[in-house]
Regions:
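Catalytic cores of enzyme domains
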Residues: 221-383
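Iron-sulfur (Fe-S) cluster-binding modules
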Residues: 1-230, 234, 238-239
Length: 383
């Protein structure tokens, strides 16, 4: 009996020690000093426990009543700890999508306040610049310093020496496609003349199946449907790319009831090069992929006889992260990104809004709120 309990305890400690050792190696490989330190200390404690277990067995300690009690507690405690980690129920807030997290009054977000619109679109000295910072003086000094450092992403290639030349060349090349797909007649396409303005009859079930299948065929990795919550529609236009300053500050209205939201996986190898330029090259590549998918998908829906608007890097009407959460692609993480079950936050999003009748997907609960409450790795790592 005692020998069996000792064997079970030793096996349990060995499994935990091996798991912790693998965690330490992974943390060292990722350059995560804090995680490696905590993991290393834990591994030493577990290894010490394993050695102590066999040392006490050798002297016959576990044949005594105190030794037997310690052995039983040593078995019960980790079992109870593991049971406490098992989720006993779903998170009702997550299952409501973004509605479950709204507290008080929420106003629609003005795209002009978005960091890229402020630092990339607003020319210093322009009328729009003066108008914006007269309304938001708290950001002017901070944004001016950011521009001096090269904008939202800094000076391209500054930390890549001596490889900055080809790296920056790849960076700008990776962002070269979306501008060609951002004009109004492309993001809001008309049907091909072949269809003579006729609607193709599809049930919501078949339309949903075909739309999702086409998006996956085009290269999306995840696809979901959401009913559009007006709160996640930008209130006013802020990103300007073709000197169409008459649109700056114009009200954005989306009359479409549905959003087709899709996610694309980013290369793990490329993302792990961050903060070097290769990680941004991957962002540009996946943004280009998203622009292609959204454009093709909107054109497909237009050919069916319905209205559709592509949302991608050069045209956004809606905030994609809350829309993706409502479409069941994942949950909002503490780091501000969508956390997916399949890829974590290592994704980019795209969207098409439409009046094509579709079947919405339910929001999901994958445990992100509970995980983020104890992890906080983003808070420790963010500069």
């Amino acid at each position: 009996m005692v020998d069996a309990l000792i064997f079970i305890e030793a096996l349990f400690l060995a499994v935990l020690a091996l798991f912790t050792f693998a965690f330490v190696i992974s943390s060292i490989w990722e350059g995560e000093k804090r995680a490696a330190t905590i993991g290393g200390v834990t591994f030493c404690i577990l290894l010490g426990g394993e050695i102590g277990l066999f040392a006490l067995k050798t002297v016959g300690f576990f044949q005594s009543m105190p030794g037997l009690l310690i052995l039983l507690v040593g078995l019960v405690f980790p079992v109870v700890a593991l049971l406490l980690l098992i989720r006993t129920g779903q998170n009702p807030r997550a299952l409501q999508g973004t509605k479950g997290y709204i507290v008080g009054e929420v106003k629609r977000f003005d795209e002009r306040e978005q960091v890229f619109a402020r630092n990339r679109s607003l020319p210093p000295g322009s009328e729009q610049y003066r108008m914006f910072y007269s309304e938001h003086p708290q950001w002017e000094e901070h944004d001016a310093k950011r521009r001096e450092r090269g904008g939202p992403l800094g000076v391209p290639g500054a930390i890549d020496k001596p490889h900055e030349g080809p790296n920056v060349a790849a960076l700008f090349a990776s962002f070269s496609i979306p501008p060609y797909l951002g004009s109004s007649h492309i993001v809001q396409p008309e049907a091909h003349p072949h269809f003579h303005e006729e609607k193709i009859s599809l049930s919501p079930e078949e339309a949903t199946s075909r739309v999702k299948g086409f998006a996956l065929h085009l290269g999306a990795d995840l696809v979901g449907i959401a009913e559009i919550n007006p709160l996640w529609v930008y209130s006013r236009r802020g990103e300007i790319f073709w000197d169409n300053w008459e649109d700056w500050g114009s009200e954005i209205e989306v009359s479409h009831p549905y959003a087709i939201v899709f996610a694309m996986e980013m290369s793990k190898d490329m993302v792990w090069t961050a903060p070097h330029t290769a990680s941004v090259v991957e962002s540009g590549f996946v943004y280009a992929k998203g622009a292609f998918i959204a454009t093709e998908l909107a054109s497909f829906i237009a050919n069916l006889g319905y209205f559709a608007t592509a949302n991608h890097l050069r045209h956004y009407d809606v905030l994609l992260v809350p829309m993706a959460a409502d479409a069941g692609l994942g949950e909002l993480g503490r780091l501000g990104y969508l956390m997916t079950k399949e890829f974590g936050p290592r994704i980019r999003l795209g969207c098409v809004t439409t009046d094509l009748p579709l079947i919405p997907d339910p929001p999901v609960d994958i445990g992100v709120e509970d995980f983020c409450r104890v992890c906080k790795k983003c808070a420790h790592c963010c500069p």
